[in-house]
């Protein structure tokens, strides 16, 4: 580049100053912010910041949000997630899964985005081969095999803005019949499995009634034969004490 002589007082000793082309930043438009928000689910201001930081590069902006979301999720991980919902899914009466996913507030538990996420988690549990929570969190996410269940949870924490926790899951597979029952808008969930050669509406209605009874009474055992003797003696003591007071 040729030097250009500029007749001003800032020329320096030689009276010559070199000019350089400045890098031009791409203007971030509302449509770009909207597109990034639809792709990631992040907030509008977060999307705008990501685009500004990456000079409007959409792929780099997504990566920026993911990294930023990871940091946010780690900060939220220590907060108590005491609310949430229980959700169940049954497939062809032969397989079922039930999950409990916690949030910090009841407001988020009722949020459509959160409930859609829990729906995806229970569908994941329906096909899982995991024997425990660690294995479940490490397995590939059904909707995007490039991510793990834990990766998606971390992203969802960043989007929703609360600590979330997949607390527990159960999966049932049977040659008979399995039904589910969810009570109180997701406060209580029950799966009931039965050995049966016949599966029809009457059988399923009967099992549904059993599931409702389980939700109401929270029994610890299925039959008398399973009752632990120490537990039985303890309950007898309580009943005798109550009877004496009456």
Residue ranges and their predicted role:
Residues 18:
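NTP-dependent nucleotidyl-transfer catalytic core
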């Amino acid at each position: 580049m040729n030097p250009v002589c500029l007749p001003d007082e800032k020329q320096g000793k030689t009276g010559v100053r070199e000019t350089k082309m400045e890098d031009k930043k791409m203007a971030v438009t509302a449509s770009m912010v909207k597109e990034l928000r639809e792709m990631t689910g992040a907030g509008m201001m977060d999307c705008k910041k990501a685009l500004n930081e990456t000079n409007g590069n959409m792929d780099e902006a997504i990566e920026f949000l993911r990294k930023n979301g990871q940091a946010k999720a780690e900060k939220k991980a220590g907060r108590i997630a005491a609310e949430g919902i229980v959700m169940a899914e049954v497939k062809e009466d032969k397989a079922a899964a039930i999950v409990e996913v916690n949030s910090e507030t009841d407001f988020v538990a009722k949020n459509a985005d959160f409930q859609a996420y829990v729906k995806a988690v229970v569908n994941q549990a329906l096909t899982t081969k995991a024997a425990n929570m660690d294995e479940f969190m490490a397995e590939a996410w059904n909707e995007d095999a490039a991510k793990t269940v834990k990766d998606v949870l971390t992203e969802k924490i960043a989007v929703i803005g609360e600590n979330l926790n997949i607390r527990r899951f159960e999966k049932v597979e049977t040659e008979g019949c399995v039904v589910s029952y969810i009570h109180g808008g997701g406060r209580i969930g029950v799966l009931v499995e039965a050995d049966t050669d016949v599966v029809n509406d009457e059988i399923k209605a009967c099992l549904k009634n059993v599931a409702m009874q389980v939700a109401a009474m929270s029994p610890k055992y299925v039959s008398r034969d399973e009752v632990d003797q120490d537990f039985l003696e303890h309950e007898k003591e309580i009943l005798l004490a109550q009877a004496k007071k009456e």
